[in-house]
């Protein structure tokens, strides 16, 4: 999937710096819009980290169900709550489980001076001075993308949940280097709180 990923030092196409009508930078404004990605129309919520938490769900052609918090917590399964891939929780409980149910990614980045920095995208506390988040959902409604941009590290990490009849729930990930310089990284990526008895 091509998001117009900025490589070779080019600016990320959706990161703006202009001021809005009240003098706030665009990085401080929630900006919903339709965008075209790989020829497909998506609904984008730019700076979604500035919004109160909300929930969404991908459409399924079969009997899959999934509820995803804008903070990343997931409950999902097939048919009903008795057949979960991730344990079924009410939205009130799920709201407290962003760091313990769903995706987990740790990225160790080697700095030019040899030091290491560990970046955990989508952790509950976000440093708004260096990071911003966007959420995308395709018009068909069966794919949802979470994106975090780290300006300090010049990296973008995004992951996608999709639902299909053949493979069921599919999660894919991508990391993009926004700078012209090569970067050395190590990634630990996986899922937490799977209900293994039902897999």
Where do the PLM segments sit?
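Anionic coordination/interaction segments
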Residues: 1-197
């Amino acid at each position: 999937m091509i998001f117009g990923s900025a490589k070779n030092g080019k600016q990320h196409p959706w990161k703006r710096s202009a001021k809005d009508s009240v003098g706030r930078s665009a990085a401080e404004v929630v900006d919903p819009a339709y965008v075209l990605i790989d020829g497909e129309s998506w609904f984008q919520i730019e700076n979604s980290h500035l919004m109160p938490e909300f929930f969404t769900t991908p459409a399924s052609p079969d009997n899959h169900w999934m509820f995803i918090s804008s903070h990343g917590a997931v409950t999902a399964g097939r048919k009903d709550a008795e057949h979960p891939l991730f344990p079924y929780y009410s939205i009130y409980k799920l709201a407290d489980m962003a760091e313990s149910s769903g995706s987990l990614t740790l990225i160790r980045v080697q700095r030019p001076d040899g030091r290491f920095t560990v970046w955990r995208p989508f952790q509950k506390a976000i440093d708004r001075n260096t990071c911003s988040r966007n959420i995308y959902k395709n018009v068909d409604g069966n794919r949802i993308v979470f994106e975090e941009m780290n300006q300090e590290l010049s990296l973008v990490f995004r992951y996608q949940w999709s639902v299909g009849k053949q493979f069921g729930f599919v999660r894919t990930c991508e990391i993009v280097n926004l700078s012209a310089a090569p970067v050395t990284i190590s990634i630990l990526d996986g899922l937490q709180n799977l209900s293994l008895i039902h897999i």
